[in-house]
A protein has these predicted regions:
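N-terminal membrane topogenesis motif
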Residues: 1-24, 79-86, 90
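Membrane-interface junctions at transmembrane-helix termini in multi-pass inner-membrane proteins
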Residues: 4-8, 137-165, 175, 185
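Hydrophobic alpha-helical transmembrane segments
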Residues: 18, 160-199
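Small-residue-rich midsections of specific transmembrane alpha-helices
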Residues: 22, 45-73, 93, 99, ...
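Helix-terminus/linker motif at the lipid-water interface of multi-pass membrane proteins
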Residues: 25-40, 112-118, 180-181
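Interfacial/gating helices of multi-pass transporter permease domains
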Residues: 32-55, 84, 184-189
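Alpha-helical transmembrane segments of multi-pass membrane transport and lipid-handling proteins
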Residues: 89-115, 172-179
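Alpha-helical transmembrane segments of multi-pass membrane proteins
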Residues: 105-108, 118-143, 160, 188-189, ...
Length: 199
């Protein structure tokens, strides 16, 4: 009964986070475009989309972690669970290392990739954003293993509450940047800061 209640509340918090995120994007995007300008916003969006593909390196392992942690907890098999977690941490370390290597290669290829579509100044901005966003994705990938483990222990309320809090934190920081100093670099830094605090 307790687990069912945990799941229901967790699901409710998850839907709330998704709805809030959609509202924030819908509300903030016009202001971000206005403050950054069409060209800088274009580079900002391009780098977010371009680096977004790096998240595929996670290979959907989160679902596997949740399933096996739940299984070993139900069986009270702590020895196997600890061995499994050791392997998972090793895999995620290699994934993070792979992301960093790919990011370094892509960084030095940005001139060739975008020379035909972006100006020199835009490429410089793209490189700065690429470093920040790549660091965010690396941290998010590392953090996802802890989120999956927490869900595996069926602490759905806690894990979804963390997502909700980070969504609110992201919104507040974005609002602050838009008011004080709206730049593409600072907007990207918000994701990095939130990724770091959520680990």
């Amino acid at each position: 009964m307790k687990n069912n209640k945990e799941m229901r509340v967790g699901m409710l918090l998850n839907y709330l986070s998704m709805a809030l995120e959609g509202i924030i994007i819908f509300a903030f995007n016009p202001f971000i475009i206005r403050e950054l300008g069409q060209e800088n916003y274009g580079v900002y969006s391009l780098m977010n989309s371009f680096t977004g593909y790096l998240s595929v390196f996670e290979f959907g392992l989160g679902t596997t972690i949740i399933r096996y942690i739940s299984k070993y907890n139900e069986e009270k098999n702590d020895t196997t669970k600890e061995s499994f977690l050791s392997i998972i941490f090793g895999i995620y370390f290699l994934i993070a290392l792979l992301i960093i290597i790919v990011c370094v290669i892509l960084y030095f290829s940005l001139n060739n990739i975008f020379s035909g579509s972006l100006s020199l100044e835009q490429i410089k901005l793209a490189k700065r954003l690429f470093i920040i966003i790549s660091a965010s994705i690396t941290l998010t990938t590392i953090g996802s293993v802890f989120s999956a483990i927490i869900s595996g222990y069926e602490k759905f309320i806690f894990s979804r509450s963390v997502v909700l809090v980070t969504t609110l934190l992201n919104a507040l920081l974005t609002l602050g940047v838009l008011i004080i100093s709206p730049t593409a670099e600072l907007l990207s830094m918000i994701t990095l800061v939130v990724s770091f605090t959520s680990i």
